[in-house]
């Protein structure tokens, strides 16, 4: 598919990326339509994919995507977690329409649905996991491009790119390669200079691993701050004057005491001596006479009632 042009040939850097990501490693099962893309079989039963055929199909898929005038008419889909981030990155780079996550049945066939779309080209990550959009695309005559493993069914798939579509690194690298070739064929980036976007941005990362890395980085930063605060804190030095004789060094203020008493004019006078509180005055009244008289009055009233 490269047409024998040296510009479109696969470089050594691309081969090293494929090998590092494990793109050439297939599965233990083989579909009869995928036999043409197999290089050999290992002793443990894993099939090796021919990377030359992978590169040719990658260029063919990029040419099909570039042929669409409106980039938004290209729909890229990935229902599996390993390809959702790569699909979103590819859509932001090329202008395609992404569907990451669950595909709503009837998106291509049910016109009453709010999420109804009419794309001109469909690109999926896994034909087995994304069987619903591939089936609906066959109803409305939408050509389909798929990343296919050794055991992937090729029913309703027009352009199959043989690769390892199970590994997170392999899937991310394939979408990165496809985005780079699309931008190169459009003339957005040059083939003479490497693309500034790294393939790591297309790799899927487990949220738990990201959280663990953030916690480890926070703990490391905390321990580093504590270490610097303990050992590198400047010690304050206070110079002290040397005193040979302590009696000479201490100055006692010589202030007359009478000065303070003279200034205070609002001091109350001292209280006068009082009588002896233990002696009580003699009472002149006779307290026993009153109750007797009162009692006689009450008795008189009672006799009247009787």
UniProtKB/Swiss-Prot annotation:
Residues 276-306 have a biased composition (Polar residues). This is Small ribosomal subunit protein uS2. Acylated. Acylation may be a prerequisite for conversion of the monomeric 37 kDa laminin receptor precursor (37LRP) to the mature dimeric 67 kDa laminin receptor (67LR), and may provide a mechanism for membrane association. Cleaved by stromelysin-3 (ST3) at the cell surface. Cleavage by stromelysin-3 may be a mechanism to alter cell-extracellular matrix interactions. HAMAP family: Ribosomal_S2_euk, Ribosomal_S2_laminin_receptor. This protein appears to have acquired a second function as a laminin receptor specifically in the vertebrate lineage. NCBIfam families: uS2_euk_arch. It is found in: Cell membrane; Cytoplasm; Nucleus. The modification N-acetylserine is found at residue 2. InterPro entries: Ribosomal_uS2, Ribosomal_uS2_C, Ribosomal_uS2_CS, Ribosomal_uS2_euk, Ribosomal_uS2_euk/arc, Ribosomal_uS2_flav_dom_sf, Ribosomal_uS2_vert. It comes from the Eukaryota. Residues 161-180, 205-229, 242-306 are annotated as: Laminin-binding. Monomer (37LRP) and homodimer (67LR). Component of the small ribosomal subunit. Mature ribosomes consist of a small (40S) and a large (60S) subunit. The 40S subunit contains about 33 different proteins and 1 molecule of RNA (18S). The 60S subunit contains about 49 different proteins and 3 molecules of RNA (28S, 5.8S and 5S). Interacts with rps21. Interacts with several laminins including at least lamb1. Interacts with mdk. [DE]-W-[ST] repeats lie at residues 230-232, 245-247, 276-278, 286-288, 304-306. GO terms for biological process: cytoplasmic translation; ribosomal small subunit assembly. One of its GO terms (molecular function) is laminin binding. Its main location: membrane. Required for the assembly and/or stability of the 40S ribosomal subunit. Required for the processing of the 20S rRNA-precursor to mature 18S rRNA in a late step of the maturation of 40S ribosomal subunits. Also functions as a cell surface receptor for laminin. Plays a role in cell adhesion to the basement membrane and in the consequent activation of signaling transduction pathways. May play a role in cell fate determination and tissue morphogenesis. Belongs to the universal ribosomal protein uS2 family. The gene is rpsa.
